[in-house]
Structure formats: structure tokens, C-alpha cells
Amino acid sequence: SLLKKTGCKINIKGRKITILGNSSNTDKITHKIIFDRIETGTYLIAGALMGKKMIIKNINPKIFKVEINVLKKMGAKITISKKSVSISKNKNLKNINIYTKAYPGFPTDLQAQLMVLMTQAKGLSKIKENIFENRFMHVPELKRMGAKIEIKNKTAFIHGPSKLTGAEVMATDLRASVSLVLAGLIAENRTIVNRIYHLDRGYEFLEK
């Protein structure tokens, strides 16, 4: 929509996008930046993990159809309104199998967070990573906290539910770091996450 406001002509056909620019347009335009999809998805998963109801406002739930559907299938209690989503924990989470895919599929940048939720679900859950290599760097750290996870090729097998115990763990990247924070929220005893500077790249004032 920003490009269209500048006068560009955009044509989308299948996986091909054609953009015809408009260099003659010098008019000022106003455009509102949308919320961060991955940051919001992280908080949705946090809401499914924690005890109290969480309400996330000023978002467009239509952008999260896949993520919300996954959380609903796992048993999370979700209510959707025009510009907000409320989510709360279900003590009897269900296992699920997912695979990462480019938008509008399930994002690779949420699989680490979802894996934490899967550790609390009954039965065997699976995540197949189709986007990046070496995307399961958080698994050894989650296992240190008591998670039962196996990696075979590009698929993670998560056995649950597992009782997580606080430990000193190390963040290897942005999404791995926030997954360890989520695990620490539900773990027994204190969790220390080292290399926390990774978080600052994607989460503003996460501690608040």
C-alpha cells in the first residue's frame, strides 16, 4: 500500500511481482507502519503458556490466521475481535505437527517459540524446518532445562508434557534467545539466559 500511495503500479501474478515506478510523483504521503508480526506472534505464544489472559491490541488478526489456527488446534483459548486478540492458557494442550513456510505459512521465526509450547503438550509434536539450515540451535539449551527433543535431519520431535527446570543457558540468535526466556517463564526455579543482547534486535523492552 505504501508503494501504491507513491503512484507505483503493482501487478502480482503467482510468485511474480511486477512494479512500475513513478519517479515524477513528488507529493508528500503519510503511511502508518504495521506491527511486527513475529514479535506479536511471540506474545501470543507467551499467552498460551502463562496462566492469566493476555490481550494484544492494535493488530490485524487476519495477518495471523495460520498462527492462530495452530494455537487453537493445540487448545489455547483465543477470542478474536477486529483489532485485538485475547489468549489464555489451556492446561491440557494437544500435540501438533507443523512445517515452516514463507508467508502466509507458519514462519520459521516462530518455530523456536512454538517448540517451547510443544514441550507442554501431551504426546509427540513435530516441527519440520523448510526455510533455513541450522535452525535448531535452541534445542540443546531447552534440553538442559528438561525438554525431551530429538532432531532428525530437518525435523524436531518434541515429546511432552515435560517439566522444565531453570538452568543457565546460552542464546545463539534472536529467536532462540526469546524461546529460552519463554521457557524460563514456566520453568521451576531461576533461569539465566546469557548473550541476551540478541533480544534487543527484535524485542523492545521485553522485560516490561
Describe these PLM feature segments:
Residues 1-208:
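Short, structured segments at the rim of ligand-binding sites
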